[in-house]
Amino acid sequence: MTATDELTHNAGRYELSHLRALEAEAIHIIREVAAEFERPVLLFSGGKDSIVMLHLAVKAFRPGRLPFPVMHVDTGHNFDEVLQARDELVAETGVRLVVAKVQDDIDAGRVVETIPSRNPMQTFTLLRAIRENKFDAAFGGARRDEEKARAKERVFSFRDEFGQWDPKNQRPELWNLYNGRHRKGEHIRAFPLSNWTEFDIWSYIGAEQIKLPSIYYAHERKVFERDGMLLAVHKYLQPRKDEPIIEKTVRFRTVGDVTCTGCVESTAATVSEVIAETAISRLTERGATRADDRISEAGMEDRKREGYF
C-alpha cells in the first residue's frame, strides 16, 4: 500500500482510504475503552483477528507500552502453530499475557469435560478469569460479517453480573458515541473490528506485513471429512472407522479448537493469494469451517447469551 492509496486529496479535503478509515475507527475504540475503564483486557486466541487487534492496540499507544494485559483462554486443544505464534508475538511486543486454562477448571471440578470438544467449556473459564482479575472491559476480535448473532451486536456490548448478553436489551449507539456505563460485577465487551470484513482483515495484514501462524497458508496435512467439513487428524481428534484419512493441500480460514475447526482445500501460500481467494468466496470463514457453530440454527447466539466471546 502506497501513501497515495492511504490518503487522497479531493476538492481541498484529505480523505482516508477505506482500510485506513477502518484502522482509525478501531484505534479510536481501543483508546476510548482505555480511557473509560479501569481494568480492560484484550482477549487473544492467536488467530488472525486477535493478532490484527493486538497490532492495532500496540499502534494506538506507541511509543508507550500497552496499558492493559492480553488474555488467552486456553482449552488445551490448540494447534501447536498457534501457541508458537502466540508466544513469539508476546515476546516481540512485550505485552503481559494472562493464560486462563480450561484444564484448571476441570481439575478443580468446576466443570465437567465435554467430549470431544472443550469449546463449550471456554465460557466458564472466560467468565471466571474476568471475575478473578476484576476486568471491567474485554476487547474481542469478533466481526459482524462472520455470523448473524455477531452481526446484531453493538461495538460496546453490555454483560450483566453473570456475564450474559441479552440481544433484545442492547444500548443504542449513535455514530461513534459509546455507552460504557456499568455497575460493579458487570462488564463491557468491546469489538474494535465490528465493521471489518474477512477481506479487510487480509488486506490490512498485507499492508502492515503482519505475521500469522503458518496454518493460515497452504500446506500438506492429513485430514478426514465429517459432515461436509475437512477436519485435521490430531491426537485430540481422530476419524471414525468410516472416515478415511487423506492427505490434502489445505489452509485454515479461522482458528479455534482442533476439535471443531475445519480447513479448506487451497493452494494460497502468500497473503496476496489468500486475498484473491477471499475475494471470490461466498461463505464466511465461520460458516464454512466451524463445527461449533453448527450445533443449532442459533448456536452462536445461545452461547453468547451465556457469556461466550
From Swiss-Prot:
Q: InterPro entries under this entry?
A: PAPS_reduct_dom (IPR002500), Rossmann-like_a/b/a_fold (IPR014729), SO4_adenylTrfase_ssu (IPR011784), Sulfate_adenylyltrnsfr_sub2 (IPR050128)
Top-rank taxon, per record: Bacteria
Spell out the reaction equation it catalyses: sulfate + ATP + H(+) = adenosine 5'-phosphosulfate + diphosphate
Keyword list, A-Z: ATP-binding, Nucleotide-binding, Nucleotidyltransferase, Transferase
Q: Which GO terms describe its molecular function?
A: ATP binding; sulfate adenylyltransferase (ATP) activity
This protein's pathway: Sulfur metabolism; hydrogen sulfide biosynthesis; sulfite from sulfate: step 1/3
EC numbers for this chain: 2.7.7.4
GO biological processes: hydrogen sulfide biosynthetic process; sulfate assimilation
PANTHER family, per database record: SULFATE ADENYLYLTRANSFERASE SUBUNIT 2 (PTHR43196:SF1)
Family as reported in the entry's similarity comment: Belongs to the PAPS reductase family. CysD subfamily.
Q: What is the protein's known function?
A: With CysN forms the ATP sulfurylase (ATPS) that catalyzes the adenylation of sulfate producing adenosine 5'-phosphosulfate (APS) and diphosphate, the first enzymatic step in sulfur assimilation pathway. APS synthesis involves the formation of a high-energy phosphoric-sulfuric acid anhydride bond driven by GTP hydrolysis by CysN coupled to ATP hydrolysis by CysD.
* Subunit comment: Heterodimer composed of CysD, the smaller subunit, and CysN.
Protein name (Swiss-Prot/TrEMBL): Sulfate adenylyltransferase subunit 2
Species assigned in the record: Mycolicibacterium gilvum (strain PYR-GCK) (Mycobacterium gilvum (strain PYR-GCK))
Write the lineage as a comma-separated list: Bacteria, Bacillati, Actinomycetota, Actinomycetes, Mycobacteriales
